[in-house]
Amino acid sequence: MARKCFITGKKTKAGNNRSHAMNASKRTWGANLQKVRILVDGKPKKVYVSARALKSGKVERV
């Protein structure tokens, strides 16, 4: 299962680390995902939801 927010679609982003000499090395930024139980089609289901979606009230825990 991909590490992706069930509600907002947020997922891992890629980019570069830059050293003092401006050398680039690949790195990733992960979304702040929490595994929570929510109602999906009237049934409880465990899904990954971003912390931002939880804080803004876009999803309600069961």
Swiss-Prot record:
Keywords, sorted A to Z: Ribonucleoprotein, Ribosomal protein
Molecular function GO labels: structural constituent of ribosome
Name by which UniProt lists this protein: Large ribosomal subunit protein bL28
Family: Belongs to the bacterial ribosomal protein bL28 family.
Gene Ontology terms describing biological process: translation
Signal peptide: none
Taxonomic source organism: Bacillus velezensis (strain DSM 23117 / BGSC 10A6 / LMG 26770 / FZB42) (Bacillus amyloliquefaciens subsp. plantarum)
Classification via HAMAP family: Ribosomal_bL28
GO cellular component, one term: ribosome
Pfam families linked: Ribosomal_L28
